[in-house]
Amino acid sequence: MTACDDAIFKCGTGVRGREGTVSILAGTALVFENLRAKLAPYAGIPLRLIVGYGFLAHGLAKWSRGPEVFAGILQATGVPMAYVMAWITIGTELVAGVAFLAGAFVPLVSIPALILLLVAIFTVHLPYGFSSIKLLSVNEGRAQFGPPGYECDLLYIACIVALVLMGPTRWSVDSYRRRLMS
């Protein structure tokens, strides 16, 4: 056996196994496994950023139009104490959005964020089915869409659960706090 037989890719022959040359795919798998191991601490960053941006954008949109506008929508859908619930929703979306973006207190802010998403699913989105896109018609070349289903809410829930299970990720306040405490 030569040194070339033990090295991956150095001779371009693939990885040598018991029964001869295994494919180049095995070597590629090892390269990707090493890359995955190096990047794993950063895996939560894209989730944090998209969830944080989503919550913050929704909260800012409701707040900029005025809580009374959102309260009117809630009241029309039969939500009790619509004005109070509008403020709770807006506050939760703003605080959770900033917290997710910063990676600060993620397990704590996940609780009200998940409750908010579940309430939205069961009070608003469930009757419209799974899909987030409901094409109603196309008039004069413009698409008309109906109310969204619960697809996006489930995606947010999955991302939040993944963030909580992953724990603090690199470049987050929670990670910084953990390093200070240890």
Model regions and ranges:
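Extended, low-polarity transmembrane helix blocks
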Residues: 2-65, 83-91, 95-182
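Membrane-interface interhelical connector segments
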Residues: 64-83
